[in-house]
Amino acid sequence: MLIVTWDEFNLCVESITNTCRDKELCGVYGFPRGGICLAVALSHSLNIPLLQEPKSGCLVVDDVYETGKTLKTISENKKITIFVWFSKSKPQWWNAVNIIDPDEWIIFPW
């Protein structure tokens, strides 16, 4: 079991911010529920709008990539930048701050 803290959350936000700072992003969208916390924090740190739905040219975030079902819904849009905090498989068309074992259970701070 992996128990993550708010300090680790802040490091994740900092990592994504540093990677995306120079990108021209129209906003950030977070998949409900886990991606919303990341999206709000990144909206503030990148000074971009929080979006109610993903659109071309935006940053899309989620807490974890497991089966790919959630992110697959937007994977066809090549103009979207996708980040997850934890990925349970090697990133292919998305970005991950951390890659973990597929069997790992994650306890988030929220």
Feature map (PLM): residue ranges:
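PRPP-associated nucleotide enzymes
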Residues: M1-W110
